[in-house]
């Protein structure tokens, strides 16, 4: 039997000291030494020099004590590391264990069983006696909380099959085995999840208390650019998250950043306005570089610009201590959080939209819709238009009314007033000389051209049509198109001559043009449009509308055929004024036209030749820019009281 533990018993422990003391006791009859006095009191004065208190000896003792303490700490650390290493390999299967076949279920059950085991044969499955703390690598965290059972079953062919069954352990044991590195494991689980977006949305709603989709609108394409972006970034290091608030400022005009802890690390919610438009891929790449987080761990979408709830959330959290805000607040947040704007946006006025389209010379529905929608940030009526469910109806009504007003305005003007009105819409800075130089280059006498142009603009019978004749590449179309563009004339194409409505544009224009007339076109003119070339009233068929009778506007033609030289059209010779362009149009070495003809040059040309063209301006039109009825207004004006 082994000696019992403790201090009781003879000859063991501290009792040995007392045996020695009894041996040296005085016996009867012993002679007492002269230098020993029994009656003397022991004061300990004879032990004064027994302890050496010199400095060197004390320092040596302290060093030895420190070394012993350091050694004890190292032993404890090594034991802990060894224990964790054993725990790591003990949690795996036999195939993954470095011990190979020597690792058995008995070893997992208790470390002491290995010392008394005679062999490592297969035994029946037993329960785990106790659980060992996690190694910290995360790979065996779940296994430590489960009970593993190995079952040997006989297969049909006589062999044995090893199967493992596991059941969940106690949740309190799992809470004790939490390790600081578990966030890395859970972040890996996020990366390996089948639906990463759903997992991130669930965690976001659990942390912030609202859905991420309540704050953003969805961009299906990653290439769509936007200046404002809302992002939720998962698994950010706390130190990096603090530095992100400073690093993002140089690239943004506005930054609203919130940081909260989640099971994957720090969860950052940010609303950023960049200095220039970026797409989702560019934003994700930049954030991944700054935060060292994979792009798959980010939710990036543009914010809801018309949601009062979303704007109120950014406003309320921006003034609280949970957020870090820098820069000027976006205008859409200011607009949606001001009560007065919210009241004004609820009322849409169609006349306001019609007035805007009329002032900007817009009659196309697509242009109206696009440009008016861009005013929603600064125009309350445009914002109400976007909120309406009848945008298509309002847009169609606006385009129809604008065309009616434009058509009536044009009909009220004569040619002089219309040219004056068009000149008022063109900027200054033109030069009339390139037009005159180009005519001289083509051999056209300038005085003859002015005389024909004066009769052309007045619509004089037999002088209502001008033909620019010449070979190809002589600048006929360039000269004619620039003239029509300045006067906002209409273009008719003979390709549509099979339709009854191909002349319908003549009803709403002051001047028209047909480019590149062919033999077929001249034959059609000779058969059906002699009175139109004369400048007499004609009847035009319009689609879904009754026939319209009007005086045909002046028509400018370009062609490679001179009808006056062909005997097939003898009746067109007196109705067409011909100017020949025989020379090729010149270009400089850079490919630019030598004679630049644009709206500014035509404005300067008409201002220079105003009197020669017999264009008159009434005194009452001098203050109204040529418009006989002044500035058009279709909105309710405000009454003004004189001082």
From Swiss-Prot:
Protein's UniProt keywords contain ATP-binding: yes
Entry-linked PROSITE patterns: SF3_HELICASE_1 (PS51206)
PTM description: Phosphorylated. Sumoylated.
Domain of life: Viruses
Annotated region described as DNA-binding region, given as residue ranges: 179-345
Naturally occurring in which organism (per UniProt): Human papillomavirus 45
Gene Ontology terms describing biological process: DNA replication
Binding site for ATP: 470-477
Segments carrying motif Nuclear export signal: 109-118
GO molecular function, one term: ATP binding
SF3 helicase domain: residues covered: 444-594
Coiled coil: none
Name this protein carries in UniProt: Replication protein E1
Database matches in Pfam families: PPV_E1_C, PPV_E1_DBD, PPV_E1_N
Swiss-Prot/TrEMBL keywords: ATP-binding, DNA replication, DNA-binding, Early protein, Helicase, Host nucleus, Hydrolase, Isomerase, Isopeptide bond, Nucleotide-binding, Phosphoprotein, Ubl conjugation
Role of this protein: ATP-dependent DNA 3'-5' helicase required for initiation of viral DNA replication. It forms a complex with the viral E2 protein. The E1-E2 complex binds to the replication origin which contains binding sites for both proteins. During the initial step, a dimer of E1 interacts with a dimer of protein E2 leading to a complex that binds the viral origin of replication with high specificity. Then, a second dimer of E1 displaces the E2 dimer in an ATP-dependent manner to form the E1 tetramer.
Quaternary assembly: Can form hexamers. Interacts with E2 protein; this interaction increases E1 DNA binding specificity. Interacts with host DNA polymerase subunit POLA2. Interacts with host single stranded DNA-binding protein RPA1. Interacts with host TOP1; this interaction stimulates the enzymatic activity of TOP1.
Catalysed reaction, written as an equation: Couples ATP hydrolysis with the unwinding of duplex DNA by translocating in the 3'-5' direction; ATP + H2O = ADP + phosphate + H(+)
EC number annotated for this UniProt entry: 5.6.2.4
Disulfide bonds: none
Placement of covalent cross-link Glycyl lysine isopeptide (Lys-Gly) (interchain with G-Cter in SUMO): 551
Chief localization: host cell
């Amino acid at each position: 039997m082994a000696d019992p533990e403790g201090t009781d018993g003879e000859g063991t422990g501290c009792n040995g000291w007392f045996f020695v003391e009894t041996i040296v006791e005085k016996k009867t009859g012993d002679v007492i030494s002269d230098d020993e006095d029994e009656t003397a009191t022991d004061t300990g004065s004879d032990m004064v020099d027994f302890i050496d208190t010199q400095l060197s000896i004390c320092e040596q003792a302290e060093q030895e004590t420190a070394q012993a303490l350091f050694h004890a700490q190292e032993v404890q650390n090594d034991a802990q590391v060894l224990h964790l290493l054993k725990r790591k390999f003990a949690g795996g299967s036999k195939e993954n264990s470095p011990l190979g076949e020597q690792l058995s279920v008995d070893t997992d059950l208790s470390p002491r069983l290995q010392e008394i085991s005679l062999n490592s044969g297969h035994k029946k499955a037993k329960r785990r006696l106790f659980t060992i703390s996690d190694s910290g690598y995360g790979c065996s965290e779940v296994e430590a909380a489960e009970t593993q059972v190995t079952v040997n079953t006989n297969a049909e062919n006589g062999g044995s099959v090893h199967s493992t069954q596991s059941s969940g352990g106690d949740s309190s044991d799992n809470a004790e085995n939490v390790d600081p590195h578990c966030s890395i494991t859970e972040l890996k689980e996020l990366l390996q999840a089948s639906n990463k977006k759903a997992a991130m949305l669930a965690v976001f709603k659990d942390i912030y208390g609202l859905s991420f989709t309540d704050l953003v609108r969805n961009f299906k394409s990653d290439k769509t650019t936007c200046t404002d972006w809302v992002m939720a970034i998962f698994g950010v290091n706390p130190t990096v998250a603090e530095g992100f608030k400073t690093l993002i400022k140089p690239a943004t005009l506005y930054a609203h950043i919130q940081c909260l802890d989640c099971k994957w690390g720090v969860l950052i919610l940010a609303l950023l306005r960049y200095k220039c438009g970026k797409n989702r891929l560019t934003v994700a790449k930049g954030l991944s570089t700054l935060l060292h987080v994979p792009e798959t761990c980010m939710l990036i979408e543009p914010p809801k610009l018309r949601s009062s709830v979303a704007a109120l959330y950014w406003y309320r959290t921006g003034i609280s201590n949970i957020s870090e805000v820098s820069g000027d607040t976006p205008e859409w947040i200011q607009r949606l959080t001001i009560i007065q704007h919210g009241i004004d946006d609820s009322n849409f006025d169609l006349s306001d939209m019609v007035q805007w389209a009329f002032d900007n010379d817009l009659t196309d529905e697509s242009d109206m819709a696009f440009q008016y929608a861009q005013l929603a940030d600064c125009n309350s009526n445009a914002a109400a238009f976007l909120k309406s469910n009848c945008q298509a109806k309002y847009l169609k009504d606006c385009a129809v009314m604008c065309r009616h007003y434009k058509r009536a305005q044009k009909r009220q003007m004569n040619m002089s007033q219309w040219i004056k009105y068009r000149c008022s819409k063109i900027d200054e800075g033109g030069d009339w000389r390139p037009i005159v130089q180009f005519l001289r280059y083509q051999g056209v006498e300038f005085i003859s051209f002015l005389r024909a142009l004066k009769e052309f603009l007045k619509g004089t019978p037999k002088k209502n049509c001008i033909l620019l004749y010449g070979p190809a590449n002589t600048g006929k179309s360039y000269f004619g198109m620039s003239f029509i563009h300045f006067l906002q004339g209409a273009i008719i194409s003979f390709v549509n001559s099979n339709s009854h409505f191909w002349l319908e544009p003549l009803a709403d224009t002051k001047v028209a043009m047909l480019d590149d007339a062919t033999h077929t076109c001249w034959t059609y003119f000779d058969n059906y449009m002699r009175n139109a070339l004369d400048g007499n009233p004609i009847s035009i068929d319009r689609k879904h509308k009754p026939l319209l009778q009007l005086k045909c506007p002046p028509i400018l033609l370009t062609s490679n055929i001179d009808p006056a030289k062909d005997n097939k059209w003898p009746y067109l010779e007196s109705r067409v004024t011909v100017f020949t362009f025989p020379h090729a149009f010149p270009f400089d070495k850079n490919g630019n036209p030598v004679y630049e003809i644009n709206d500014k040059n035509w404005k300067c040309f008409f201002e220079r030749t105003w009197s020669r063209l017999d264009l008159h301006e009434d005194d009452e039109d001098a203050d109204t820019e040529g418009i006989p009825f002044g500035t058009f207004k279709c909105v309710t004006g405000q009454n003004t009281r004189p001082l």
